[in-house]
Swiss-Prot record:
Domain of life: Bacteria
Keywords, ordered alphabetically: Kinase, Nucleotide-binding, Serine/threonine-protein kinase, Transferase
HAMAP family assigned to the protein according to its UniProt record, in alphabetical order: PDRP
Organism: Trichlorobacter lovleyi (strain ATCC BAA-1151 / DSM 17278 / SZ)
Catalytic activity: N(tele)-phospho-L-histidyl/L-threonyl-[pyruvate, phosphate dikinase] + ADP = N(tele)-phospho-L-histidyl/O-phospho-L-threonyl-[pyruvate, phosphate dikinase] + AMP + H(+); N(tele)-phospho-L-histidyl/O-phospho-L-threonyl-[pyruvate, phosphate dikinase] + phosphate + H(+) = N(tele)-phospho-L-histidyl/L-threonyl-[pyruvate, phosphate dikinase] + diphosphate
Name of this chain's protein: Putative pyruvate, phosphate dikinase regulatory protein
Keyword Coiled coil: no
Keyword Transferase: yes
Gene Ontology MF terms in the entry: ADP binding; ATP binding; phosphotransferase activity, phosphate group as acceptor; protein serine/threonine kinase activity
Role description: Bifunctional serine/threonine kinase and phosphorylase involved in the regulation of the pyruvate, phosphate dikinase (PPDK) by catalyzing its phosphorylation/dephosphorylation.
Length: 269
């Protein structure tokens, strides 16, 4: 079995993913990837190159310290080892393009990568728990948004998810009991959304028009909407520990900022 060694002054996770992506173009090749992480000095570089040479492997490396990258290149050539520098050419091009030098701080790429996957995990969670789906998973949410239909629950949930928060949202419908799971949630995680009846009628009317449905639909009837909002307020009063915000005149960004600001004890932007 052939071996590809991934050498890095950080975790090597990002470089390994790049290698695996490239390997996917070669079908079912019998290749093992071995990670050599946290290589931070020339002695460790020499030991790593010796190991790869003994196995007749391919060396792929990402080292932000240019002196270490040069050392790997030099020692690999001395051993007749096939080695590929993933990072240095890009750092050089970016340095020329931006007119500045790289920080040469190991681990920054891994941190960016980690943040990205954390956001993706949050987005996936939020999609699965949109509009009352998967109520059994509410307890795993960072935030739970509650409100009547068209009160910005979904766009607000997705905006917060893209900041890395796992968000579930639950619709309030007069005449239908909210899910029991909602009562078991830590009150400090729940946000109740309010909106003026007039604005809600405008939003719902626009939706009916876009969907080609009859304007006589009670969904956008002013009196029915007023009843829904009254029910909503009454329900919120039974949960004094919830954060209640009015989204009537706010953009999604403004509502999200208010939520994070007022829950600063739990979340930091």
């Amino acid at each position: 079995m052939k071996k590809i060694y991934v050498l890095s002054d950080s975790t090597g996770e990002t470089a390994e993913r790049v290698v695996r992506a490239a390997l996917s173009q070669f079908g079912g090749s019998d290749v093992r990837i071995v990670r050599l992480a946290k290589v931070c000095n020339q002695q460790e570089v020499q030991q790593a190159v010796a190991t790869v040479t003994a196995d007749e492997g391919l060396l792929v490396y990402t080292l932000v310290d240019s002196s270490l990258a040069v050392a790997v290149h030099t020692i690999a050539e001395e051993h007749g080892l096939m080695a590929f520098d993933l990072l240095s050419p890009l750092l050089h091009s970016l340095s020329v393009f931006l007119g500045t030098v790289a920080q040469s701080t190991p681990g920054l790429l891994h941190q960016i990568d980690t943040d990205y996957f954390r956001r993706m995990e949050a987005v996936n969670f939020t999609v699965k728990h949109d509009d009352g789906q998967e109520n059994r998973g509410l307890v795993k949410a960072d935030l739970v948004l509650v409100g009547v239909s068209r009160s910005s629950k979904t766009p607000l949930s997705m905006y917060l998810a893209n900041k890395g928060y796992k968000v579930a949202n639950v619709p309030l419908v007069k005449g239908i009991d909210p899910p029991e799971e909602l009562e078991a949630i830590d009150p400090s995680k729940v946000v109740g959304l309010l909106i003026s009846p007039k604005r809600l009628v405008e939003i719902r009317t626009s939706r009916l028009v876009n969907m080609g449905q009859s304007m006589k639909n009670s969904y956008a009837d002013y009196e029915k909407v007023e009843d829904e909002i009254a029910f909503c307020r009454q329900y919120y009063r039974r949960h004094p520990g919830w954060l209640i915000i009015d989204v009537t005149c706010k953009s999604v960004e403004e509502s999200a900022s208010e939520i994070l600001r007022r829950l600063v004890g739990q979340f930091a932007e």
